Amino acid sequence: MIVFIGVDLGWYGKPTGLAALHYATSALEQHAITRLEPVAEILDWISQQIGGEDAVVGVDAPLVIPNSSGIRRAERELNAEYRRYHAGCHAANLSRPFAPNVLAFSRALSERGFAHGAEASPRQPGRFQIEVHPHSATVALFGLPRIVKYKRGRREDRSRELRRLRRLMLERLPALDPPFVPDLPRIPLSGNLKAVEDQIDAVLCAYIAAHWWKWGRQRNAVFGSNQEGYIVVPKRGAYSPPSCL
């Protein structure tokens, strides 16, 4: 068995969405989903979910930031391909206030035996961490003309888009490879959406990790490198788009 962990990291020390998927034969199974805040609790949760198994941790946050200013090559390359879909990503450099937190999290994973996996081969044994980008991944996996815009705006609009993302995941992920039937939280009719959003994002991060482990560069793109910073995204065109977006 191999375990895939999705981490929608709270960049500024805020709560983090977490998901754990297990792959034993030919399909993924969702094992756990939660939201935690203290980094020590997050790392303990990851260790408990993995036990003694091999694992890939997909993190929606910069894990390698060598540049003191400007933008990483990974972001420049991703933006060149995905900005037209409104899926570009923000610049990461050492002067950004989130840098200490995200780099400390990556170091903690490294200390626990998780090597950076941008150069790993498909189905390679071991434990790896990879940086992922859910927005561009949904464009690629679901054949979307634009991202699902559930991050900003009025609650009504965000709720509608989050429901759309949930529906796409429920309908499309079982038909992909590896197939996966997610168990996603329902979107609340009122109140804050952030907790549900973080957990759904974490499931996406875990699925991207599984997709990378199974297919490597055959069906995934790697922007950047282990040394300069990297982002793993499924390749566009690997799967047919849904009949109704």
Each predicted region: which residue ranges?
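RNase H-like (RuvC/DEDD) metal-dependent nuclease/polynucleotide-processing core
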Residues: M1-I5, L9-L245
